[in-house]
């Protein structure tokens, strides 16, 4: 494995597809179990909080609390699916299975591998988010066409959290460290981004912090789409998600290059 192969830049514009395809072939053998695993937690939130708090809260922003929550759970499902794929699964392919090492002996470069891992994580995020959306549409909390319109944003959400997850993978010495990321980063993001309750109900300091969280931008796009409301500040939200995709991508590849060349 040479230093040239462990470069931060992709070797070709479509080389990442080989990585995506490899992961897809390995995943499809256990696809149903994987999908059900990613759907379980958001569905528990949807039905548990929706049935419990929905009675007490009533309506939020002119819609039922369950409809409000459903849109948040679509974005949350994309976040958790992409995060799991790029920390636990990608770390396993890098360290335990040594799959990355084998790939780097081919024409693939490190940038291709990272990009392929991110694309695969975004694919799983889109499937997970769409799965929650299908349940919401079947129960009448959104329109089927609205769910279709939300799919690009769901995938973009997956890419953003996949990119962040790759940074964590690059830094983590072992699997044990991922619990800190999930507990100290992902869980606060869930509760501060407006997935479960409106951001404007939070103290001002948390409202300010929420503006910088990727899930907030995702929800601000997905929720109005699913509820049939006008979407405002589209360029701002999409631009913020793109920043969360691009900057961590280059950071993770640089960190991984240093790690793999030790």
UniProtKB/Swiss-Prot annotation:
Keyword Nucleotide-binding: no
InterPro entries, sorted: ABC2_TM, ABC2_TM_bact-type, ABC_2_transport, ABC_transptNodJ, Nod_factor_ABC_transporter
N-terminal signal peptide: none
Bilayer-spanning residue ranges: 35-55, 60-80, 125-145, 148-168, 177-197, 231-251
GO MF annotation list: ABC-type transporter activity
ABC transmembrane type-2 domain sequence ranges: 33-259
Localization in the cell: Cell inner membrane
Keywords assigned: Cell inner membrane, Cell membrane, Membrane, Nodulation, Plasmid, Transmembrane, Transmembrane helix, Transport
GO biological process entries: oligosaccharide transport
Record-linked Pfam families: ABC2_membrane
UniProt membrane topology term: Multi-pass membrane protein
The keyword Endoplasmic reticulum appears for this protein: no
One cellular component (GO) term of this entry: ATP-binding cassette (ABC) transporter complex
Main location: membrane
Similarity remark: Belongs to the ABC-2 integral membrane protein family. Lipooligosaccharide exporter (TC 3.A.1.102) subfamily.
Subunit structure: The complex is composed of two ATP-binding proteins (NodI) and two transmembrane proteins (NodJ).
Function: Part of the ABC transporter complex NodIJ involved in the export of the nodulation factors (Nod factors), the bacterial signal molecules that induce symbiosis and subsequent nodulation induction. Nod factors are LCO (lipo-chitin oligosaccharide), a modified beta-1,4-linked N-acetylglucosamine oligosaccharide. This subunit encodes the transporter.
Protein name: Nodulation protein J
Organism of derivation: Rhizobium leguminosarum bv. trifolii
